[in-house]
């Protein structure tokens, strides 16, 4: 349906903003020609800023690949006004905020958010990046190592590898061809060999390119626009303006030599992918007409008659996406990516024939006004009823948009097609021709068939030319399937009215309970959007009873999603999302989006559960997909492996992936057919319904589900016995004990090692929670600074809190290519020893400042229904049911004394603490494997070496579960 537009005037120019947006906007231009968009939001708890600089990796000097990205790293270090190293990040982190940046081809974007009461100083520190940064020689060398570590992390990532291969196969004199991340070789070894000083080049690059007139700033504050403007004018007007012209890189990256090519590449992971791309007219020049969005909508559609539906029916594909890929003002690629099955890999030519058949269909049918109008209506509703998101996420895109779009479209960008122009769309359709395509085909089956290697990632590949006539042969060989345009979308909402809910509950209430289910209900009292959130957790004791059951339950949920895909895809396009996935004790159904037609989708999904049957052809495809996923576990980043082992050690009723992979090899369709009725035979459904839904509607939804599943003359489900209600249990580590688990990295080609150093502390308790959280806040930046910035152990360095079903702890996570896990573990202990004095000597003022920052973080309001619902659902699912958690913990924080934090640290965290319980997971990459034996010999006493994870877990006491503890009786 058409939605009333809402405009606001910005610097004398009208800007399109969402109808539901009550923020105020103002555009100003400083005397140095810096363009700034000010946003005032009195309701915000966090303030944020984003600076977009119109220079990126395309401007890297020859022989200094990655310099723009390296500069992005360096600006975080220090400035003349704030010379203490890393003080910017420290200040932001200690005041509840976060910092980040990215380098793109023609843009570098810096951004942060922080608690509102600390915004002034944070913004001033940020401004100094662009006024007088310090780039010391010592810091320069250390940060080159950080960039190198970041690159090491990417070397075995298929996404990074294929992207660089696509760039490699382009014109060498076009910047698209470049390697943009940088590494030790490009930023130190090669320049040094040529007598080039990287630091001098870094400063030169900064001075040449960082000019106020090609920067765009967005500042999001709580104060009035006038006050924010005053801040910005004081802080940012000293940025130098050297009147630079935004760099442009005309010309196409691909010549005839790089088109009509078939590239076969060998990926790291199992699976086959087919990517086809065409150089096309950049949509940015016609964003109101949205040619690539229109074509992506149709070629990427998954409903009946679509290309994907045909490929899925043939058993050849498991996924397909289409749309505009990399683009600038001068070039663009339209890309189609297809995930192939093993059978699909053997029918690549027919698949490409079907793709070109579908493109021919689009050429023959012409551009349809009703499809464009439908797409426009969906986009318009999405824009005007968009959820509020965290300020930093919101403004990053706006800052980038300011470079490209006229002022009126800064907020909307190209997300709102409004002008139907068949000629412009037809032009791009015609560009998707057999004469200018590029095919990238990835499979491990090409092992031994390649003769080339991409230089930066060493990806093995081969290349051959494919003529238009060959494509025509493939088109003729394609199977005869009925491809057609999608049907009109029945899920587009037409009722966007808000319910006048009688209940004004501020927390979920238990609305209904029966032997079959329990319904928690929370009406929308905050967001005023026509949306709802539904969560239904099917607790099935059989689901987690063995590795076999876990795999069978997984296959069941995937088959459900598979069967519903062509129907539910329309709902997804219209802004109504659903998913069926594994949960701790069974499987869960999630629905989120416009409430108008949500119940139709919910009842369809439940009907499919009730009438579930196994289709052998779809089972075979799903089994193949899941098998490859398990086989690819061994290619995960080492720190992900370490976190997995930590969970496997701690969480009861979890099974090793190797055992689940073994189950898959023997699984047949009839096993699933026999299992699902048994899985569902004993079930309890925990329900949460929130948003623009009245309480009687919520009750009616759940009653309908009970009628379908439990109250049939031959019910599919029966209620659980009281003894069957499942609980999540977590291993209780021994006080004063250290536990160690040493393991080879599962990918022999990966040089990176990883450590997770976990300290288990307590069972959910408000007063203990706040002490652990305060320790985490105070120690987080110190950890990052010491282990990453100073010691350069690795790009991935983090201190994070951990919550396993209400059992709280803290974990240090480090991945490194330069040091082994034993050494890293010793550095974590050293860090904790050094932290003692910092904590003991902390001034009362600093203590109060940290407490205030944590209080502000806790009082931060939920931005949208999804965020709020996830918070409450965690309480329901874990059984803690502390819906007042934030307020209670704030109350406890206000009473907290500094000595209590010190006592907590001394008792549970510090090295040698009497009640400390630590678990070190050490994963050894290929270059540190030889250190494992000596590391094992050197573990201190008293300690436990875990050899058999499941054997260890079964022999340990478990923490009590919150589920069933203090909950309302059924």
Swiss-Prot record:
It comes from Arabidopsis thaliana. Peptidase that might be involved in pathogen or wound response. Not required for peroxisome biogenesis, indole-3-butyric acid (IBA) metabolism, fatty acid beta-oxidation or degradation of glyoxylate cycle enzymes during seedling development. Zn(2+) binds at residues 69, 73, 150. GO terms for biological process: proteolysis. It is found in: Peroxisome. Gene3D superfamilies: Metalloenzyme, LuxS/M16 peptidase-like. InterPro entries: Metalloenz_LuxS/M16, Pept_M16_N, Pept_M16_Zn_BS, Peptidase_M16, Peptidase_M16_C, Peptidase_M16_M, PqqF-like_C_4. GO terms for molecular function: metal ion binding; metalloendopeptidase activity. The active site is at 72 (proton acceptor), 143. This is Insulin-degrading enzyme-like 1, peroxisomal. Its EC number is 3.4.24.-.
């Amino acid at each position: 349906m058409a939605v009333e537009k809402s405009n606001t005037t910005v610097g004398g120019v009208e800007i399109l903003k969402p109808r539901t947006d009550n923020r105020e906007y103002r555009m100003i231009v400083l005397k140095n020609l810096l363009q700034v968009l000010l946003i005032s939001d009195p309701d915000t708890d966090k303030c944020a800023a984003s600076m977009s600089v119109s220079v990126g990796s395309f401007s890297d000097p020859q022989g200094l690949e990655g310099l723009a990205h390296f500069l992005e790293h360096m600006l975080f270090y220090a400035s003349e006004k704030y010379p203490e190293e890393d003080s910017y990040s420290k200040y932001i982190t200690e005041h509840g905020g976060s910092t980040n940046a990215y380098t793109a081809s023609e843009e570098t974007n810096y951004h942060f958010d922080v608690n509102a009461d600390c915004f002034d100083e944070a913004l001033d520190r940020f401004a100094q990046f662009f006024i007088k940064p310090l780039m010391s020689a010592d810091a320069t060398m250390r940060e080159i190592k950080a960039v190198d570590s970041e690159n090491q992390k990417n070397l075995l990532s298929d996404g990074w590898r294929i992207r660089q291969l696509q760039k490699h196969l382009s014109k060498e004199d076009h910047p698209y061809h470049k390697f943009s991340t940088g590494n030790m070789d490009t930023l130190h070894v090669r320049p040094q060999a040529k007598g080039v000083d990287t630091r001098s080049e870094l400063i030169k690059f900064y001075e040449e390119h960082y000019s106020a007139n090609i920067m765009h700033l967005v500042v999001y504050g709580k104060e009035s626009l006038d006050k924010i403007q005053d801040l910005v004018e004081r802080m940012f007007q000293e940025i130098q303006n050297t009147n630079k012209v935004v760099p442009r890189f005309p010309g196409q990256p691909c010549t005839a030599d790089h088109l009509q090519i078939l590239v076969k590449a060998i990926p790291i992971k199992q699976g086959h992918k087919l990517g086809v791309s065409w150089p096309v007219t950049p949509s940015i020049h016609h964003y109101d007409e949205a040619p690539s969005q229109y074509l992506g909508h149709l070629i990427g559609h998954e409903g009946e008659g679509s290309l994907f539906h045909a490929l899925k029916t043939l058993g050849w594909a498991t996924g397909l996406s289409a749309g505009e890929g990399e683009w600038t003002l001068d070039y663009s690629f339209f890309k189609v990516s297809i995930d192939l099955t093993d059978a699909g890999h053997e029918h690549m030519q027919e698949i490409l024939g079907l793709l070109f058949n579908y493109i021919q269909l689009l050429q023959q049918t012409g551009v349809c006004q009703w499809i464009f109008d439908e797409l426009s209506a969906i986009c318009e509703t999405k824009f005007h009823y968009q959820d509020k998101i965290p300020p930093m996420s919101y403004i990053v895109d706006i800052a980038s948009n300011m470079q490209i779009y006229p002022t009126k479209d800064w907020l909307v960008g190209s997300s709102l097609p409004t002008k139907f122009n068949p000629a412009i769309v037809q032009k791009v359709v015609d560009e998707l021709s057999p004469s200018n395509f590029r095919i990238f085909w990835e499979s491990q089956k090409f092992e031994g068939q390649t003769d080339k290697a991409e230089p930066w990632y060493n990806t093995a590949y081969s290349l051959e030319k494919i003529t238009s006539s060959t494509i025509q042969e493939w088109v003729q060989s394609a199977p005869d399937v009925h491809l057609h345009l999608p049907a009109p979308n029945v899920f587009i909402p037409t009722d966007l009215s808000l319910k006048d809910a009688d209940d004004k509950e501020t927390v979920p209430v238990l609305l209904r309970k029966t032997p079959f289910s329990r319904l928690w209900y929370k009406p929308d009292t905050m967001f005023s959007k026509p949306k709802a959130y539904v969560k239904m957790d099917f607790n099935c004791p059989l689901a987690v009873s063995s590795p076999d059951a876990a795999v069978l339950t997984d296959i069941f949920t995937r088959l459900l999603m598979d069967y519903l895909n062509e129907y539910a895809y329309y709902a997804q396009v219209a802004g109504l999302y659903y998913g069926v996935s594994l949960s701790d004790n069974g499987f869960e159904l999630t629905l989120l989006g416009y409430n108008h037609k949500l119940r139709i989708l919910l009842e369809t999904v439940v009907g499919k559960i009730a009438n579930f049957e196994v289709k052998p052809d779809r089972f075979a495809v799903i089994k193949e997909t899941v098998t490859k996923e398990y086989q690819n576990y061994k290619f995960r980043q080492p720190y992900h492996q370490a976190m997995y082992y930590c969970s496997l050690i701690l969480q009861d009723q979890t099974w090793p992936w190797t055992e689940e992979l073994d189950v898959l090899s023997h699984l047949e369709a009839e096993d699933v057919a026999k299992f699902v009725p048994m899985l569902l035979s004993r079930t309890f459904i925990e329900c949460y319904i929130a948003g623009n839904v009245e309480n009687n509607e919520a009750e009616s939804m759940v009653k309908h589900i009970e009628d379908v599943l439990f109250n049939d003359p031959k019910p599919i489900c029966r209620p659980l016995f009281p003894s069957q209600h499942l609980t999540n249990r977590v291993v209780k580590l021994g006080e004063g004990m250290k536990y160690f688990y040493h393991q080879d990295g599962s990918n022999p080609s990966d040089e990176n090692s990883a450590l997770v150093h976990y300290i288990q502390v307590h069972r959910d308790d408000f007063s203990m929670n706040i002490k652990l959280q305060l320790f985490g806040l105070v120690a987080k930046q110190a950890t990052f600074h010491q282990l990453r910035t100073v010691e350069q152990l690795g790009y991935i360095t983090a201190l994070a809190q951990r919550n396993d079903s209400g059992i709280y702890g803290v974990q240090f996570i480090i991945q490194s290519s330069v040091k082994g896990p034993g050494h890293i573990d010793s550095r974590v202990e050293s860090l904790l020893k050094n932290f003692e004095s910092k904590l003991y000597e902390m001034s009362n003022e600093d203590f109060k400042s940290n407490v205030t920052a944590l209080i502000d973080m806790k009082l931060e309001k939920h931005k949208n229904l999804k965020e709020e619902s996830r918070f409450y659902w965690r309480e329901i699912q874990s059984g803690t049911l502390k819906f007042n958690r934030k307020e209670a913990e704030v109350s406890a924080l206000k009473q907290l004394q500094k000595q209590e934090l010190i006592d907590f640290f001394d008792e549970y965290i510090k090295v040698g603490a009497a009640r400390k319980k630590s678990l070190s997971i050490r994963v050894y990459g290929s270059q540190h494997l030889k250190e494992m034996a000596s590391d094992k010999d050197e573990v201190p006493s008293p300690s436990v070496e875990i050899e058999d994870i499941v054997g260890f877990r079964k022999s340990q006491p478990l923490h009590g579960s919150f589920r069933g503890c203090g909950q309302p009786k059924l």
